[in-house]
Amino acid sequence: MAELLYLKEAEQVVTVAGASDKPKVGEDLSEIGVIERGSVIVEGEKIAFAGTDADARHYLQKRSGKVKTIEATGKILTPGLVDPHTHLVFAGSREQELTMRLKGKSYMSILQAGGGILSTTKSTRAATADQLAHESRLRLDRFLQHGVTTVEAKSGYGLATDAELKQLRVAQQLNNDHPVDVVSTFMGAHAIPPEWKQDPNGFVQLVAEEMIPQVAAENLAEFCDVFCEEGVFTVAQSQYILEEGKKHGLKPKIHADELVSFGGAELAAKVGAVSADHLLKASPTGIEQMAEAGVIAVLLPGTAFFLMTEPANARAMIEAGVPVALSTDRNPGSSPTESLPFIMNLACLTMKMTPEEVLAASTINAAHAIGRAKDIGSIEAGKNADLVLFDAPNYQTLQYNYAVNRVDTVMKAGKIVVEGGVLLEKTDNQRCSLATEDRGTRPIWQK
């Protein structure tokens, strides 16, 4: 019989329960199921009980076997955070572009001059799979220290069949050997590479007719994404790629209406996309159609913050009944952060979402955006024991005390992987510092 873990008497247990079948929308987004002085009991990899501490003690009295107690007094307990939009696997860095943008260059002008995504593509193509895996593990380590237990990871920095497959194989490897679960998305249509600049339709055909079948044949991704944007992929090109993806079992996602109102939100509704992401310039009609179709809006306030632009109109989407999720958009050009808690801060401060809304958007709704809501995203009996203890007296403090990492303990599938804010090495359960590129070391993980 598995040892029971008793997370005892947290100041608050934020369950976000009751929305595993469909995401929270409208006023329900603020209903996050807070249990004051609550406790959670974990058995093996699953949550066995969540409720008041008095009820937890009664539950334990009826059980036999060993019980390990983790004192949670003075802390709050939430579901493991879920990041539904990252560009995790890449090589290189683009810090020089920050100075370019500060001097007036736009994101698209940098891209069209061969920088931006194309700069990262050059580095990623040149990197070996081992190099990509090493750099990406370090990013996952930092995600974990910020309370993120599941991430989505897109390809899109290969922009050639072999390089795209390389990225996706690395993501699959990381899912197998790192505590953070990695859910893969194929995004060969992230930009037009230089060799196809004079024949963009030819590249679209390559993505749809060569890349997608190979991705599906190797079962390397669950979703297909496309950058539907002026100067990148047209609505017609985007629809063709997404429909071809659907034929091969890849569920559609869209980078939509980030820079201009371009019809991406409307296309997301038309093709039945799981999510439309960015949406800074989404039209009122597009928002209405997304609500009717149940398309999740994955909002990325960190990208708007870093690019110094106005964020998406989260309030209009929530009031229209669009399910809203939050994400870091971790990437080297427009959102170089692994701190989903900081993104939650930005959602409050720049998009006027409430502390309750951002918690739901970063847990259960984010889980819906990657098809994992039946297993993660809330604290309910039978779900995976992905949990975070924050060193905070209440959940409001997480958004009030902004840009501070208050993660104390992270549990993944019933195993403690972060304690006292520090990663634990699974092989001997000894504390180790966060690996960095300079130290060249990392925790050894095996699922």
From Swiss-Prot:
Ligand binding (4-imidazolone-5-propanoate): 94, 157, 190, 258, 334
Residues annotated as binding Zn(2+): 85, 87, 255, 329
Binding site for N-formimidoyl-L-glutamate: 157, 331, 333
Gene3D superfamilies: Metal-dependent hydrolases, Urease, subunit C, domain 1
UniProt keyword terms in alphabetical order: Cytoplasm, Histidine metabolism, Hydrolase, Iron, Metal-binding, Zinc
Family: Belongs to the metallo-dependent hydrolases superfamily. HutI family.
Entry protein name: Imidazolonepropionase
Organism encoding this protein: Shouchella clausii (strain KSM-K16) (Alkalihalobacillus clausii)
Lineage: Bacteria, Bacillati, Bacillota, Bacilli, Bacillales
Gene that this polypeptide is encoded by: hutI
